Amino acid sequence: MPSLPHFIACMLATAAAGFAVEPRAANSPGWIRVGGDRTGFVHEDGRVFVPWGFNYDHDRDGRLLEDYWDPEWATVEEDFREMRDLGANVVRIHLQVGRFLRGPAEPDTAALRRLRQLVALAERTGLHLNITGLGCYHRADVPAWYDALDEKSRWEAQAVFWKAVAGVCAGCPAVFCFDLMNEPILPGADKPEGGWLAAEFGGKSFVQRISLGLAGRRREDVAKAWVEKLTGAIRAVDTRHLVTVGEIPWGMTFHGAKPLFSDPDIGGPLDFASIHVYPKTGEIDRALPVLRDHARGRPVLIEEIFPLSCSATELGAFMVSSRGAAAGWIGFYWGRRPEEYDRDASVANALTRDWLELFSRFTPRMTSR
């Protein structure tokens, strides 16, 4: 149970941001930190904490959280309870930059107020939040002013986003971590890019560039400067919550490719590595060396995992085999219980049902250390 000082700190941070304070449940989540051996996470009292949960990136109809959290708040509450009942202790939410910034230097106070209510919901439900920011998942919803910014101005706006979000959440133990951006990438050395968003997947732009051109700089230096800029914005108002970046493990695609943001020389201000792993049938064993290569003296969270290119059985075998290298696992939940997927006997629905059933069945095994 979080101590009285932590309860007061969370209330003060919220009140200072100008938002109403909601009472916290007695069983609300406590603070999480990196363990002393730098391989995993622990509670304040030293008990091991294994992040085990879901990406709550969209609902069953493909709508993003901000599309329905105002008119359908009861749905969000129900989904959080269902994720908890399936065994989750962490929920990863994906905040869209266009919903939290009204302009380059103007946070949206209504969105911040709703975020604080979501943190309170997590507290009441007994869940931690991984708050991933700067999303531009629906290309049509990205503000024209944001798309038009040059690199320096875009980074400044991103810093405004993170300072506002972190300011609302500072002092609240239910927040497990801040993830600066989902799958940031950089252009090639001699290949300036024409747009900030990479190709879509399933109608969504999950991958985003942090620069359109290196202009003679090293990719490593650009990545390092970006991490320092955004973590600096967070640390100006919040010195305690963990910070990470959701990284594509390029070694899964290109043999010998090395980590970028997981490299301590580049992602020095980050507290742990977060990678997205989708094992392929026949190549399951290939993921383990890549996973270990991302550790580099810090915990590695598998922040995205799903049987996209393998069976649920194969995925389960990989997850068990990765226990010595991974500090936690976050899959996906899209607003339906496992039995609801039986109503439509499509291959995709059967795969999702199998995943959710595996997740629930594996909960005791994967969260005990």
How should these model regions be labeled?
Residues 287-290, 305:
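Conserved alpha/beta catalytic core and glycan-binding cleft of carbohydrate-active enzymes
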Residues 333-369:
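Aromatic- and carboxylate-lined catalytic core of secreted/periplasmic carbohydrate-active enzymes
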Residues 29-270, 282, 305, 309-318, ...:
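Active-site mouth of glycoside hydrolases
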Residues 289-300, 311-325:
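Surface-exposed substrate-engagement region within the catalytic domains
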Residues 21-29:
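N-terminal pre-domain segments of enzymes
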